[in-house]
């Protein structure tokens, strides 16, 4: 392998006026000498925050991961940075030629642990959206097994958050991989960082 991102809740908020109503701008007459002013920037920011709540998107899937699609899930007009981690299957391990990896996960615990990681990130950095997607089943060489994307107003927060996310995922989330070699042999592996899988 090389590395890993998930589905929480996405929603859009849409407000429409009935056709029989006019907007306040259209119907209200302006007093003489009235000068229109832009709303305060703080007010605009508050409105943006209400319309776009932070999202934690977590997904395990047997389908091929699209880095572009996962990245797009965290894009926000409030953010100037999207940072990514993409883990792919490499073609060798200790001199053996790897043709694919096979992933398994204990899903209830895995999803719960990733949500904890997302909460930890939000306590440490001012990020907007977080997406963590991980493949299950067979993943051929060069395909992505993990995609993590984080958006933030400035790049430092999202870069640090992505690094923390993959390190924590490898250490805490119950995911196993089987390396399948060219000579028709295979071997189950665990992440060395996993405290819960440590040898006695």
UniProtKB/Swiss-Prot annotation:
It catalyses: 2 [molybdopterin-synthase sulfur-carrier protein]-C-terminal-Gly-aminoethanethioate + cyclic pyranopterin phosphate + H2O = molybdopterin + 2 [molybdopterin-synthase sulfur-carrier protein]-C-terminal Gly-Gly + 2 H(+). Residues 16-30 have a biased composition (Polar residues). One of its GO terms (biological process) is molybdopterin cofactor biosynthetic process. It is found in: Cytoplasm, Cytosol. InterPro entries: MoaE_sf (IPR036563), MOCS2B_euk (IPR028888), Mopterin_biosynth_MoaE (IPR003448). The keyword Phosphoprotein applies. Substrate binds at residues 154-155, 170, 177-179. This protein is produced by a bicistronic gene which also produces the small subunit (MOCS2A) from an overlapping reading frame. This is Molybdopterin synthase catalytic subunit. It comes from Rattus norvegicus.
């Amino acid at each position: 392998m090389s590395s890993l991102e998930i589905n929480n809740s996405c929603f859009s908020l849409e407000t429409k006026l009935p056709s029989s109503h006019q907007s306040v701008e259209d119907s209200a007459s302006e007093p003489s000498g009235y000068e229109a002013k832009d709303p305060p920037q703080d007010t605009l920011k508050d409105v943006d925050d209400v319309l776009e709540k932070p999202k934690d998107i977590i997904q395990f899937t047997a389908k091929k991961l699209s880095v572009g699609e996962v990245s797009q899930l965290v894009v926000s007009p409030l953010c100037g940075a999207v940072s990514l981690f993409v883990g792919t299957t490499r073609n060798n391990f200790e001199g053996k030629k790897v043709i694919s990896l096979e992933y398994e996960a204990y899903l209830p615990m895995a999803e719960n642990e990733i949500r904890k990681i997302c909460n930890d990130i939000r306590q440490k950095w001012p990020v907007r959206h977080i997406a963590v997607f991980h493949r299950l089943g067979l993943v051929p060489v060069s395909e992505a097994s993990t995609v993590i994307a984080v958006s933030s107003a400035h790049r430092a927060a999202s870069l640090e958050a992505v690094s923390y996310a993959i390190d924590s995922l490898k250490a805490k989330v119950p995911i196993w991989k089987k390396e399948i070699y060219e000579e028709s042999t295979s071997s189950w592996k665990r992440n060395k960082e996993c405290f819960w899988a440590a040898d006695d």
